[in-house]
């Protein structure tokens, strides 16, 4: 259970960072 919660939290953090990077790359291209 603890491992599952850790994986979920880690996944959310990774997605948040990935979206930020992807967003900045997209903005950089359009600008």
Swiss-Prot record:
Please give the residue positions where the record annotates the modification Pyrrolidone carboxylic acid: 1
A Gene Ontology molecular function term for this protein is: hormone activity
An annotated GO cellular component: extracellular region
Transmembrane region(s): none
Subcellular localization, per the record? Secreted
Q: Which UniProt keywords apply?
A: Disulfide bond, Hormone, Pyrrolidone carboxylic acid, Secreted
Keyword Disulfide bond in record? yes
What InterPro entries has UniProt attached to this entry? Insulin-like_sf
In which family does this protein belong, per the annotation?
A: Belongs to the insulin family.
Q: What does this protein do?
A: Relaxin is an ovarian hormone that acts with estrogen to produce dilatation of the birth canal in many mammals.
Q: Whom does it interact with, and what assembly results?
A: Heterodimer of a B chain and an A chain linked by two disulfide bonds.
Q: What is this protein called?
A: Relaxin B chain
Query: What phylogenetic lineage does the species belong to?
Result: Eukaryota, Metazoa, Chordata, Craniata, Vertebrata
